[in-house]
Amino acid sequence: MESGNERISSQSQGTIHLSKEPTFLIQQATLPSDLHSTLLQETQCGGLTKNIKANTQKRRPGTVILSKRSSRIMSETQPRPPVIPSRRPGFRICYICGREFGSQSLAIHEPQCLEKWRTENSKLPKHLRRPEPSKPQPIGGTDSHSLQAANEEAFQSAQAQLLPCENCGRTFLPDRLLVHQRSCKPKGENPGPPSMGSSNVPTGLKKASSGIPARPRTLICYICGREFGTLSLPIHEPKCLEKWKIENDQLPRELRRPQPQKPQPLPAGQSSQEGASQAALVPCPNCGRTFAVDRLPVHQRSCKSQPSGPKTSNSNIERKGGPNPPTNSKQQRNMEAPNGDKVTGVI
């Protein structure tokens, strides 16, 4: 009996112990189930992600197949890119230079561009000058078609200002054509007939057939033969003539020259200015070479003359290797001494 009571008491104590900590036991009892549920959720999520990855991997080749469709199908399904217009909408073209400007900027630009065009056109040779471009008449309406028509007319007006190169045929603006022709050489010997008659132009005014001035236009002074600009020559000639008179008066009478006359342009195309400058040259009385009046005295200092007059024959003999007078005093004494003295001297 006692042993049975002890067993009952031990069982009751165990139940009391269990009743004292019900939460701990409940947690111990519930932990395995929670872990199981969480593990199930994780495995389910992992399976879903694997399925999603597998599905995406399976779907990717489909996109590649879609990109390899024919161009016809692609053009039907995909949207077409927008068409960019050739010119910016709302901009107007200058009828002089062909550049684009806004509607408000064009009204400010056109007077300045026309003034610049007139200045550059006046600097060109006469055969390259162009008539002043006329502004096209405005077309009624404000739609895009009327603006495009006005721009097309202005563009054609600007293109009409271009000039073709005589050598290569390319077109340029008149002021740029001169720059181009400096490096564009003609292919043949005679690229084309010159527009300006070179026969009526003196050597100082001769230019290339293309009208490119390699240097500023010059004229030759009929007194001294030097070249001067077209504006500088009228200032130089009176001073040069006054200087010539002073220098001519200082010369001896036999060397004085008549006053040079200003030549008139010759119709045959001869260089009258060069002839006048050559006529103003004075020949040297010793050697016959011609010099300017002020340079002749400088030349005569080295080209000495004898008092009897010009001795051209002796000078010619000397040039040909004729007998020259002995310059050494010892040689001169030997030549003056008799032959017998020379023999006795040698013996």
From Swiss-Prot:
Zn(2+) 3 binds at residues 221, 224, 236, 240. Zn(2+) 2 binds at residues 165, 168, 180, 184. Residues 303-316 have a biased composition (Polar residues). Zn(2+) 1 binds at residues 94, 97, 109, 113. PROSITE patterns: ZF_C2HC_C3H. The keyword Cell membrane does not apply. Pfam families: zf-C2HC_2 (PF13913). It comes from the Eukaryota. Zn(2+) 4 binds at residues 284, 287, 299, 303. InterPro entries: ZC2HC1A/B-like, Znf_C2HC_C3H. Keywords: Metal-binding, Repeat, Zinc, Zinc-finger. A zinc finger (C2HC/C3H-type) spans 90-119, 161-190, 217-246, 280-309. PANTHER family: C2H2 ZINC FINGER CGI-62-RELATED, ZINC FINGER PROTEIN 474. This is Zinc finger protein 474.
